[in-house]
Amino acid sequence: MALKWTTVLLIQLSFYFSSGSCGKVLVWAAEYSLWMNMKTILKELVQRGHEVTVLASSASILFDPNDSSTLKLEVYPTSLTKTEFENIIMQLVKRLSEIQKDTFWLPFSQEQEILWAINDIIRNFCKDVVSNKKLMKKLQESRFDIVFADAYLPCGELLAELFNIPFVYSHSFSPGYSFERHSGGFIFPPSYVPVVMSKLSDQMTFMERVKNMLYVLYFDFWFQIFNMKKWDQFYSEVLGRPTTLSETMRKADIWLMRNSWNFKFPHPFLPNVDFVGGLHCKPAKPLPKEMEEFVQSSGENGVVVFSLGSMVSNMTEERANVIATALAKIPQKVLWRFDGNKPDALGLNTRLYKWIPQNDLLGHPKTRAFITHGGANGIYEAIYHGIPMVGIPLFFDQPDNIAHMKAKGAAVRVDFNTMSSTDLLNALKTVINDPSYKENIMKLSRIQHDQPVKPLDRAVFWIEFVMRHKGAKHLRVAAHNLTWFQYHSLDVIGFLLACVATVLFIITKCCLFCFWKFARKGKKGKRD
């Protein structure tokens, strides 16, 4: 009997302590690959007993209001329908994929217009939330402990400011590292850290460093200034005081960067930054029966996995046939994620799928190569499982991601718009038959696995840490409180130069005075 009551008491105590450590997390939702990373973290938070509420628009592409998942959805109405929103995104993606990238400035200016269009949509979503008094009252009364958001899609920091609670960012990159540098205080010396979207490596020639500096200036004085004006005005109106987006973002307690040093080029970082790249990666699960049979039928030659991501749903008939012709000439079997009309040149060794279990395929022992658009999620999965890549980058950070892998000897790049079947065929033969590519990717894989704490556990730790301590201001550097000229010590340099100039002026005056005195005395002596 005593044992029975002891057991009951222990169970009650466990519930007491568990509930005491649980927190309430408000999430400003993202879409596509951004959401896939966030969802991995959120599900782990739920597993640990936290209450997670995801703020999603009625036009959201990835959320189903009727989904009975462990994540609580708070759907807010917006003027766009789901179909309209998806069509807009697909049109923007189509425009991005058609941008000619062989000129110096044109790709940036065209991508900038598209990014501004996306920003306008996100800002309207944000307005729909903060102007919804009933929803805001409900959220206020819920007494959340923290806001979790992606820095690429502003609004989460505004909600945190309105509710007076700390917030944590999940982030990959912003064009030109604008948010990271101006809002996060990140340090990216242009002498050896290439600007994102520049396609440069950290081993730059003099002219490449000149090019990199021009990119920095472009993003600082054009993209940053003109893109932020609307956000600054909107935040000032909502908060009832003059402010800026950057000023609000600077209050972030922790930045969880979805990068790692085996992928990105090294650079300095701050105390409130942790790198959790590859947090979504996991061991491969068994494949569906039909797919496993097809993979096993490849024999010793193995298989090639081909995917251009979730945002590219179709391609021209001409490009599809160029690719199909190349794939038909390799001895490997090919699993191609493709949502379009079957190419006429499709070989017997290639099967088309509207969806593939990419992580599980990359982790299969028969996989020999991965043809990818260069999305960060896919690259991390390839690194995790040690699969060399052929990169066909399309837009945004994808050319940079492939440039990183190429610099590390783990990938070959081909251009989607100009490649021939021979180009793709030769690239595949290189990464499959040249053992150096497998060796290099396996080295990166070993580094990815050799971490004292898994990236996902670190990400969850920092969110829980901020909830426990009501923030992490002790990790926030004082640089956030300085103006740009104070940060670069221009006021100090100016003061010291003024001091030197004053001393030189006094010395010069003294010398002139002495010279005048001696000259006068000499003239007087001559007259005597």
UniProtKB/Swiss-Prot annotation:
Cellular component GO terms, alphabetical: endoplasmic reticulum membrane
GO biological process: estrogen metabolic process; lipid metabolic process
CDD domains (alphabetical): GT1_Gtf-like
Signal peptide feature range: 1-23
Membrane topology listed for this record: Single-pass membrane protein
Reaction equations catalysed: glucuronate acceptor + UDP-alpha-D-glucuronate = acceptor beta-D-glucuronoside + UDP + H(+)
UniProt modified residues of type N6-succinyllysine: 134
Glycosylation sites: 66, 314, 481
Keywords, comma-separated and alphabetical: Endoplasmic reticulum, Glycoprotein, Glycosyltransferase, Membrane, Microsome, Signal, Transferase, Transmembrane, Transmembrane helix
Membrane-crossing segments per the record: 492-512
UniProt-listed PROSITE patterns: UDPGT (PS00375)
Enzyme Commission code: 2.4.1.17
Molecular function via GO: UDP-glycosyltransferase activity
One Pfam family hit: UDPGT
Subcellular location: Microsome membrane; Endoplasmic reticulum membrane
Family indicated by similarity: Belongs to the UDP-glycosyltransferase family.
General function of this protein: UDPGT is of major importance in the conjugation and subsequent elimination of potentially toxic xenobiotics and endogenous compounds.
UniProt xrefs under PANTHER family: EG:EG0003.4 PROTEIN-RELATED (PTHR48043), UDP-GLUCURONOSYLTRANSFERASE 2B10-RELATED (PTHR48043:SF86)
Protein name from the UniProt record: UDP-glucuronosyltransferase 2B10
Lineage, top ranks: Eukaryota, Metazoa, Chordata, Craniata, Vertebrata
